[in-house]
């Protein structure tokens, strides 16, 4: 039964029993929640933001998380409910004048007071170290202790004067029950926002359908009608064969819009038109452009102007 050296093992050393639950140091847990970022595990530094579940983050860490949503991140579950920068609120914190920070114990020969906090409640003066419940308002981001809101009941923020409702109050680092309640509110708020977006889309569609004339006019540039109105013609074939009036051509050129002739339009000769002789002399069909065989050059010296 004995081992080397005359030692005798006891029963609890040999028999395996159920594992004991590891006890977490409450002071260390409070320091981690109120002084370190939930996402990056770094010391909280301004600007400090809080999510809809009441967790504290560094704003830089949240932006980096949103830009790089890779599966390799170990702490992605802590911020999986944050989909955009609009889901977090920047906090307005009041500094604690009694907090010395790292300057108080530079040599390491003094006791560090873990209960001393960087921020306090601006109304009551309680330190934000986890011993007292704190909350913030979604509308403005001001942070107060829960005792201040209970003692001074008002529908207006004590610091900036912004109006708020009970749904805007979010508890910082609350219990499991508080987190479940805040999660339900968050889901209801997001569903309400989706329904509002869906109701807005049909309204815009009905407004556009009620005004068809304005949409057609705005779709393209306005067309200016030039010339005299066309007279009613019983026979459409005669209308195709007749040439276009001279006034309509001049008006079309003056308005700056040159339209293509229709497919069924007949080609007309410039020599038969009623233009002036100087205008006709430009074209090769004019009598001045025609040359006799004697005036034209032979096959060696011919140019393109001879034809």
Curated annotation (Swiss-Prot):
The modified positions for Phosphoserine read: 288
Which CDD domains does the record cross-reference, listed alphabetically? RING-like_Rtf2
Q: Where is this region: Disordered?
A: 193-296
- GO BP term, example: mitotic DNA replication termination
Bias-annotated ranges (Basic and acidic residues): 227-241
Q: How is it modified after translation?
A: Undergoes proteasomal degradation, via DDI1 and DDI2. Removal from stalled replisomes and degradation are required for genome stability.
Subunit comment: Interacts with DDI2; probably also interacts with DDI1.
What family is this protein classified in? Belongs to the rtf2 family.
PANTHER family for the chain: PROTEIN C20ORF43 HOMOLOG (PTHR12775), REPLICATION TERMINATION FACTOR 2 (PTHR12775:SF0)
Write the protein's name.
Replication termination factor 2
Provide the gene name from the record: Rtf2
